[in-house]
Amino acid sequence: MQNRLPTTYRIASVKKETADVQTFTFEVSLGARPGQFGMIWLPGVDEVPMSIAYDDGKQLKITFFAVGDMTKELAKKKEGDLVGLRGPFGTNYEWKKGQKLALLAGGYGAAPMYFTAHEAIKDNCDVHVFVGARSKDHLLYIDELGSLKGVTLHVATDDGSEGYKGYNVNQLSEMIEGGESFDEFLACGPEMMLKAVSGISSDKKIPSQLSLERYMKCGYGLCGNCVVDPLGIRLCIDGPVINNDICVQITDFGKYHRDDVGRK
């Protein structure tokens, strides 16, 4: 059930994932599906959208990178502190029972991809997860993904410090050229990674679902800050998960974002 108004919840636990990435666990459920996001609120600071890393009906997790003013303040919070949450918002990843899926995760996109893999294997899907990061020290959710039965984990790092040396999209492409096949791609990560996944999807005629990120304020489609050109899609309600046949029509996909007042 969607919680449309900010409600404060206590942080049940804090996990330090990397030097700049943390995971908060809350003893609450928003009824979220993989790919959806919530609005995270700190009174007197700001409210920002974040992908939901896990929601099993009892616990909810968010994983975030402390990069801006809001997330740096959030990173100071400890177990027992209060944080405002509302949601879930947006579209989610979808699949059919028994499909062979390639899940591509770049950076902290590994968090929602773990949630996706966790749910997809319940439908007897053959799940391959391609996790990419700059280096071994930046990899996320490797242990969690590796522990899921029914998941084949592929790791890629830009510097070759762990797994395949290069981009996870290149790793996927090489496997496909070698004869591997998939029914669908699901991806979350930096937009240039998504652009590359989109290209393979179009070339090989394999459907894909991509999670696009834009500046979001309301979550209701009212403010228009997350609108993408030229279709007028509001990513907070028509996305963030978009099918590739729609993505290829978006002129700013892989090119530019609008800022907090809508400027290119």
What label would you give each PLM region?
Residues 40, 84-85, 228:
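A generic structural signal for residues embedded in beta-strands
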Residues 1-81:
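Ferredoxin-reductase
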Residues 229, 233-238, 243-264:
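Short Fe-S-cluster ligation motifs
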Residues 13, 54, 155-157, 210, ...:
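Structural signal for conserved beta-strand scaffold positions within catalytic alpha/beta enzyme cores
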Residues 46-53, 90-99, 236:
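Short, Lys/Arg- and Gly-enriched loop/turn segments at beta-strand edges
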Residues 69-215:
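FNR/FR-type flavoprotein reductase catalytic core
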Residues 191-192, 213-240:
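Local cysteine-cluster metal-coordination motifs and their immediate loop/turn environment
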